[in-house]
Design a protein with these regions (language model features):
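Extracellular glycan-recognition regions
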Residues: 1-146
Length: 146
């Protein structure tokens, strides 16, 4: 389970034909309600997303779930430069902030509006991944960390 303030590190190797993969954070126990940091090799991008995206309103035009993701939460990433389709990730969670670092060369930050859900895990869509060297560090408020 995730504390409100923690750091997660891992190495992810993906199959060359994988559509998308990533890490789900602040998830409910069914992994269907939370935040996702998603790698999309075909589109050469990394995306921060959440599900459900917004609450459905009274009228049909209030539905916001047909957007593929929040465009402002996308970063370009050149997957062709990777050696053996491997990425090193570091996620820092600090209450309502999630920050993803990829290979110490790219950062993506998002605000989370529900940091009480404690579950997290890795996922893949249409492909396969190997996750290794998984470490979670619990950070106590007021302490320095490196």
């Amino acid at each position: 389970e995730m504390n409100s303030t923690c750091m997660i590190e891992a190495k992810i190797e993906y199959d060359g034909n994988t559509r998308s993969f990533g890490i789900g954070l602040r998830q409910d126990n069914s992994f269907s309600n939370g935040y996702y940091l998603r790698f999309e090799p075909f589109y050469n991008r990394v995306v921060a997303d959440m599900w459900p995206r917004c609450i459905q309103g009274v009228n049909q035009w209030y539905v916001d779930g047909d957007k593929p993701f929040m465009v402002e939460l996308e970063r370009p990433f050149d997957y062709r430069s990777l050696e053996n389709n491997k990425v090193d990730i570091r996620v820092i969670a600090d209450d309502t902030i999630l920050c993803l670092y990829v290979n110490d060369s790219m950062a993506l930050t998002m605000r989370v509006y529900n940091n009480e859900r404690p579950f997290w895990g890795f996922f893949v869509n249409d492909g396969s991944i190997k996750v290794s060297d998984i470490c979670m560090y619990h950070i106590c408020k007021g302490e320095n960390y490196v």
